[in-house]
Amino acid sequence: MPTLRPYHPNDAAVPTALYVRSVRHYGPRAYSPEQVAMWAATADVARTAARCGDGRFVVVAQDEAGSLLGFADLEADGHLDLLYVAPEAERLHVGSHLYGAIEAHARRRGLHRIFVEASELARPLFERRGFTLLGRNDLVLDGVDIHNYRMEKRWVEMEVQGLP
């Protein structure tokens, strides 16, 4: 089972490299070589460091040796921006552990929803976690057509008074 811990600023290069490896490994299962190349090219260490240091909640998963297995983030408004798992951690439920930490954090913060733009590959993970499909985004990035899905999960915290 992976260990979850908060992101540390010294981690910036590692999640960026993991992001690229993840996109290149999993991407071809649902996207063309051109789409995968464009997606992987969006990785940038400085941008990762800026994003992860801007106050959002960032959690990383690591193995016993301290190697990064995945990472995820949640912005203050409930937007889950990134959730990536290393190819060598496939089928170890790292994505589920990361998502669980994200949702627990959102609930502790008093949020009532999480929303995401999920890739074709991530959509099933979010559907299994109770997300609703809101629509498909058809995008052109750097001249390449690609798509993702707008999804959200809402919950209501209920207070029942007068019950034991």
Feature-to-residue mapping (PLM):
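Conserved N-terminal entry element of GNAT/NAT acetyltransferase domains
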Residues: 1-13, 156-164
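Acetyl-CoA-dependent GNAT
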Residues: 6-9, 17-90, 99-101, 105, ...
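Alpha-helix N-cap/helix-start capping motif
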Residues: 68, 119-120
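Glycine-rich phosphate-binding loop
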Residues: 93
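Conserved short alpha-helix immediately C-terminal to the canonical SAM/SAH-binding motif I
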Residues: 98, 122-125
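Conserved GNAT acetyl-CoA-binding A-motif
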Residues: 106-119
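Conserved catalytic-core motifs of GNAT/GCN5-like acyltransferases
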Residues: 115-117, 132-150
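Conserved active-site tyrosine of GNAT-family acetyltransferases
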Residues: 126-127, 131
